[in-house]
């Protein structure tokens, strides 16, 4: 999502929300959980407002964009709650943009700490137009084929969490950064160009304007109901192994939040058993609580999609440390500086 779009969303939110008061909580969030009607966010936000009387002021943008906005507002924070994905949540923590807060659900959530907590499980995925392509690209090398020239697009590393995940997945699949950047340099010949948001690529694939794009499992499964030509795939490495980077939605309380107590209430609400039980039903995500296992068809479909695909994750703190240098190198090899 472009910064101008983020600004427009912010203006809309401020114009449509009540005057600044104790009955408001402001959320800066990565896209994906508010897609479509009756989304998980929408249902939980409505339930939260009904239970507490606290209105949600919602601003949406790319995973890196929302953190950049927090950083710019450091001296005058406007948000109470941040939802983004790795490695941007680690960057926010390192830049001291997050406040200490242990959630009520911390003991039931692996990887939760005093600065942030996983909110919804999710994984990097890729999508293709199944009407125009008889089969999905089988491997990373297949994506270099000339038939994908100007028919392939992935969101921009450093701006979009899913785009950053593509770069990290390449590191994993190719076994080294050098090999990965060499590949991504070649892939650029087919790449349409930059995209600050991943979510909008699905419609382009569905219409056939492009054949292949990146995404994430939760968002793509939710979008497929409205985009019938889209199917999910994972390209294999040279050993024939398919793998998917785990990129959960992660939530944290903003340092200096104007309505900190309301932010804490919302975070605890979204991590409650009741809310977590419905994340697959409403938005195709997977709950992060170890004591919640949904039985709905969406949850079954999400777990089935991952069969034969190995999930993995790096040391996110290490990723955050080298991210700026890696993004700079990506711009250099793709000649997109």
Swiss-Prot record:
Give the UniProt record's GO annotations in the biological process aspect.
thiamine transport
Q: GO CC: one term?
A: outer membrane-bounded periplasmic space
Question: Which is a Pfam family this sequence falls into?
Answer: SBP_bac_1
The record's section on InterPro entries has: AminoethylPonate_ABC-bd, SBP
* Keyword terms: Periplasm, Signal, Transport
Location within or outside the cell: Periplasm
Main location per the UniProt record: periplasm
| One MF term in the entry's GO annotations | thiamine pyrophosphate binding
What range does the record give for the signal peptide? 1-21
Record bears the keyword Transport:
yes
Family statement drawn from the similarity comment of this UniProt entry? Belongs to the bacterial solute-binding protein 1 family.
Fetch the NCBIfam families from UniProt: PhnS (TIGR03227), PRK15046.1 (NF011620)
PANTHER family xref list: THIAMINE-BINDING PERIPLASMIC PROTEIN (PTHR30006:SF3), THIAMINE-BINDING PERIPLASMIC PROTEIN-RELATED (PTHR30006)
**What is the stated purpose of this protein?**
Probably part of the PhnSTUV complex (TC 3.A.1.11.5) involved in 2-aminoethylphosphonate import.
What's this protein's name?
Putative 2-aminoethylphosphonate-binding periplasmic protein
This chain's source organism reads: Salmonella typhi
Please name the taxonomic classification of the source.
Bacteria, Pseudomonadati, Pseudomonadota, Gammaproteobacteria, Enterobacterales
Q: Which gene encodes it?
A: phnS
